[in-house]
């Protein structure tokens, strides 16, 4: 009943109006799985390759017809007749057939769409929800938790057209008892933030991930307006709600210095920027910082981990790119203490699960994440619950491409009840 009989690839549109790959995997018995690949804006240099056509006359060169052709051609031919329940086997066939280190022949966008669609089809054939199937693939059947959301309510950097250097300013409703309550708390703060910004005469247009993208006097001012909104919503900052940032520091790393336009084009060394961040953590309850330095600045990261690593969560995104080879090296060198997990950085479900396992085995946390270019596909919600990862980053409280994931978490929590606890602050490295 779980034998693959047909695979279909197609070009669809993501949340930025760019094409992406969607795949359908059809099994005997009429079971179907469908999934779409996301796409990033600030990307790590060692990510698996997202295959684009490069034909400037079509979608400004961003078409994905080559990746779709790979799905409908060689990938489909290789997988028809195979058992969808063998996720590792399915992914290995595609990876071996591609034959490149970074999936550049078929594109990680092609391989990932099929990989996720296959998992959904197999779950359907087994008569179980996707999160339950993922827990079995992960070797942790029946072990679930609801993730603490990191809600990106002010967008800067590559995610917005404003003068804020730091890419994401996030809130974490750690004081909630359930994910549904956490989402309500986040929504209330989001709406109060709009009122705060409007009262200051600031723009309330939103960025790629649904957060506001105002022009602010400094990066610290973003934290100040969020603190004001948290208070206005009736919550206590540091107790009910904590703060997190994604610096995406590679985006403002120039000639060995960190150049912040929002701080008057001031240039910082690795050590100076680490202490700039440290000062912010003293002023505000920031409990997680992602990509606090450039992805290649490993000496700087070692210093940053030494200074901040026993106090807060230091998340590697561009640093580790969901790649077990790079993560292993980081663990050995004591770099950071958490990894951001993005399916499309590595390009298959099996490799994603391997990265989560390696992180957890080393005492690192794993934060499941969306990309800035998303679709209505909500697979990351099931991944977060099915691996009991504990944290999820999926944008703000607006834009259907972000809210789709929150709504899926609400549905899953309703189905699982007490089997999937919401552990709040305990999930964040250094906060237990």
Swiss-Prot record:
Cofactor descriptive note: Mg(2+) is required for catalysis and for stabilizing the dimer. A second Mg(2+) binds during catalysis.
Modified how: Phosphorylated on serine residue(s). Seven-fold more phosphate is incorporated in glucose grown cells as compared to acetate grown cells; less labeling is seen in stationary phase. Another paper suggests this phosphorylation is actually due to poor resolution of substrate-bound enolase.
UniProt pH dependence: Optimum pH is 8.1.
Region called Interaction with RNase E, residue ranges: 5-34
Binding residues annotated for (2R)-2-phosphoglycerate, in chain numbering: 41, 159, 167-168, 209, 342, 371-372, 393
EC number, as in UniProt: 4.2.1.11
A GO cellular component annotation in the UniProt record: bacterial degradosome
Catalysed transformations (reactions): (2R)-2-phosphoglycerate = phosphoenolpyruvate + H2O
Keyword Lyase in annotation: yes
Residues annotated as the enzyme's active site: 209, 342
Cofactor dependency: Mg(2+)
EC class: lyase
Keywords from the named record: Acetylation, Cytoplasm, Cytoskeleton, Glycolysis, Hydroxylation, Lyase, Magnesium, Metal-binding, Secreted
Location within or outside the cell: Cytoplasm; Cytoplasm, Cytoskeleton; Secreted; Cell surface
Residues found modified as N6-acetyllysine: 257
Family: Belongs to the enolase family.
Function noted in UniProt: Catalyzes the reversible conversion of 2-phosphoglycerate (2-PG) into phosphoenolpyruvate (PEP). It is essential for the degradation of carbohydrates via glycolysis.
Protein name (record): Enolase
Organism: Escherichia coli (strain K12)
Upper classification of the organism: Bacteria, Pseudomonadati, Pseudomonadota, Gammaproteobacteria, Enterobacterales
Name of the gene this protein is made from: eno
């Amino acid at each position: 009943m779980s034998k693959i009989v047909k695979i279909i690839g197609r070009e669809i549109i993501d949340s930025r109006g760019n094409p992406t790959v969607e795949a359908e995997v059809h099994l005997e018995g009429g079971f179907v799985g469908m999934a779409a690949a996301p796409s990033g804006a600030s990307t790590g240099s060692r990510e698996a390759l997202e295959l684009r056509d490069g034909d400037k006359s079509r979608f400004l060169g961003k078409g994905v017809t080559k990746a779709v052709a790979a799905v409908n051609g060689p990938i489909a031919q290789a997988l028809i007749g195979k058992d969808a329940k063998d996720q590792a086997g399915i992914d290995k066939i595609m990876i071996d057939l591609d034959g490149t280190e970074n999936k550049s022949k078929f594109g990680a966008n092609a391989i990932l769409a099929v990989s996720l669609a296959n998992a959904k089809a197999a779950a359907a054939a087994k008569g179980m929800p996707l999160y339950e199937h993922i827990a079995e693939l992960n070797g942790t059947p029946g072990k679930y938790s609801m993730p603490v959301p990191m809600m990106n309510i002010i967008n800067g950097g590559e995610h917005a057209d404003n003068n804020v250097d730091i890419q994401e300013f996030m809130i974490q409703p750690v004081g909630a008892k359930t994910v549904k309550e956490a989402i309500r708390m986040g929504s209330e703060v989001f709406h109060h933030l709009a009122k705060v910004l409007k009262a200051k005469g600031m723009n309330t247009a939103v960025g790629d991930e649904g957060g506001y993208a105002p022009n602010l006097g400094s990066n610290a001012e973003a934290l100040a307006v969020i603190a004001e909104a948290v208070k206005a919503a009736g919550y206590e900052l540091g107790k009910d709600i904590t703060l997190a940032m994604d610096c995406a520091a590679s985006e403002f790393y120039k000639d060995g210095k960190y150049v912040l336009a929002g701080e008057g084009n001031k240039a910082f060394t690795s050590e100076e920027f680490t202490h700039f961040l440290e000062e912010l953590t003293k002023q505000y309850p920031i409990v997680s910082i992602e990509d606090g330095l450039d992805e290649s600045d490993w000496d700087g990261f070692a210093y940053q981990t030494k200074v901040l690593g026993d106090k807060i969560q230091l998340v590697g995104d561009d640093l580790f790119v969901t790649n077990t080879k790079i993560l292993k090296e980081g663990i050995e060198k004591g770099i950071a203490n958490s990894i951001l997990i993005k399916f499309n950085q590595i390009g298959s479900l099996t490799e994603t699960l391997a990265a989560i396992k390696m992180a957890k085995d080393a005492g690192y946390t794993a934060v499941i994440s969306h990309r800035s270019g998303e679709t209505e596909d909500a697979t990351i919600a099931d991944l977060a619950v099915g691996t009991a990862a504990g944290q999820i980053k999926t944008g703000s409280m607006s834009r259907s491409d972000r809210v789709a994931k929150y709504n899926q978490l609400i549905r899953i929590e309703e189905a699982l009840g007490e089997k999937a606890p919401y552990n709040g602050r305990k999930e964040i490295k250094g906060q237990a």
